[in-house]
Amino acid sequence: MLDQHAALDRVEALRQSALALVRNGDYEDALAVYDDALALATDEDARELITINKADAMIALERSGPEVHELARVIMRRRNVRHVYLAAYALQYKYRLENDLKRALFYGQLALRTAEEANEPSWRRIVLLELGNVYELDSQVATAIRCFEESLAIGEESSANRDRDLSHAYAIENLGYCKLLEGKIVDGLAYIHEALEMLSDPIGRAEAYVDLCYGYLEAHDYDKARFYGEAALELAKEPRQIRNAHYLLGEASYKAGDTAGATFHFDELAKHYPQFRNLKSLLFAIDLRSMVNFKL
């Protein structure tokens, strides 16, 4: 019995180590640690949770695989309400990244209902943040703002969740971006700077830097736009953040009269889209900001 408990403790320690790597943006290393945990785990609940966590990291890397395919089965089995919530949450994130907003909203609403059934305000707070992101992508900015504001209004904390400060900061950051979309540049920048004071994880800080780059570009403050765009590139590991930073830095450099800088960043962006051979020429000819959704 002692050996069994020791094995469970070891598996959980590995899972926590992988989660810490994910929070730091080290997804590849996290996947390897999740594999180590799965190799040791014999308890079905533990294996299911690790599978969900690994799928989450794979989704962040925009990959698929057996673990990602397992998420729907976790929901169908409904063996553990927390696992149902986490699987639904992961699937809404997957479909949000794929711009399948109908499915993203379906799984987001499922995660929200599960949080309400479990009477877990902190779960509800986090999924409201994600639903706000989906509505934001769907150009339903007013609905997105309501989700973010409702998320911010939830102050309770469950013993199973220790990320209230992080989700609170994310909600403020996303609220700021929505204000930018509404043309309320001063308010939007203020919210994002407020969030930046609370964000400690590289992913969140990189997102805030990208949005500040966008906001200052909208405000025609090209020096600040370039400062925050470069800061985003230093931290960004998610492909979306890297693409957006290069695009915005290219625009800011071009507007500032730095053609060489614009060329560099547009060239870097073009590497992500090899199917579009004339992308750089198009970017020099047309300002695409009004046509680009920076959360995709």
Regions found by a protein language model. Give the residues of each.
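TPR-repeat structural position
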Residues: 27, 64-65, 101, 121, ...
